[in-house]
């Protein structure tokens, strides 16, 4: 990819690196490794050096907190969504401990077979003898690890961009704001969660996989890029109206 960047001779760029390095850990319940900070930093520097050598200008984006994606649910949220009254859920932590889940942990929305009988004869997730697997859960320690990695990656991105006088789009702050919800310039409601009280919310910026932005989410991100480009590079690109872009929907 680095060679491709050099050969393409870019004059303008947008860079958003590192999401996959974090999300491979998140989506696997912490069973897949995080990219070492040193490796991430070295790769960022190589790419940024290649872009700078071309004399290109652009926008660098930092990384949002990956633990805010709808894929991850607090046990209390999952119980309300599933209408489970027999709780707590039992989980297997990254350290191999089997214990009741707390709201300091997150259970993946994709966790399968919850409540189905296991070989032990007990329903999965509701008894110590039949806990959710480590790959179904991000326990409190794993959440801390991925948040520390996010902070380290962002320090690299911000530092390397600043050394070259490139602006940084603060996607981390943006996604923190969408978690609580807000109204945009056009009065459109913007939020992260796409299910509330068992109902699908049309205002969410996420697809129903709980991980990737939908059309509405990509339009929101485009507006953030446009705002930075217009401000820093004195462009006059019009922003998008999110109401023209579809939110989450189930396949028919």
What spans do the regions from the language model cover?
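Mobile gating loops/cap/lid regions near enzyme active sites that modulate substrate access
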Residues: 73-148, 155-211
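Histidine-centered active-site loop/cap adjacent to the catalytic His
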Residues: 193-251
């Amino acid at each position: 990819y680095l060679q491709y960047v050099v050969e393409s001779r870019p004059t303008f760029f947008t860079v958003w690196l590192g999401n996959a390095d974090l999300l491979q850990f998140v989506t696997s319940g912490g069973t897949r490794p995080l990219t070492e900070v040193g490796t991430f930093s070295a790769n960022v520097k190589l790419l940024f050096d290649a872009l700078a050598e071309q004399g290109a200008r652009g926008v660098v984006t930092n990384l949002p907190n990956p633990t805010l994606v709808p894929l991850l649910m607090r046990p209390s949220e999952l119980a309300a969504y599933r209408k489970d009254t027999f709780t707590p859920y039992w989980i297997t932590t990254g350290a191999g401990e089997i214990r009741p889940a707390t709201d300091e942990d997150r259970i993946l929305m994709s966790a399968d077979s919850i409540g189905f009988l296991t070989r032990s004869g007990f329903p999965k997730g509701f008894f110590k003898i039949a806990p959710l697997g480590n790959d179904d859960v991000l326990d409190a320690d794993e959440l801390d690890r991925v948040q520390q990695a996010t902070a380290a990656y962002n320090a690299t991105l911000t530092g390397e961009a600043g050394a070259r006088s490139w602006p940084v789009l603060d996607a981390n702050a943006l996604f923190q704001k969408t978690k609580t919800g807000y109204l945009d310039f056009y009065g459109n409601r913007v939020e992260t969660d796409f299910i509330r009280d068992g109902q699908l919310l049309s205002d969410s910026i996420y697809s129903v996989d709980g991980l990737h932005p939908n059309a509405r989410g990509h339009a929101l991100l485009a507006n953030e890029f446009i705002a930075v480009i217009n401000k820093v590079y004195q462009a006059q690109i019009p922003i998008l109206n999110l109401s023209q872009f579809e939110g989450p929907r189930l396949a028919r």
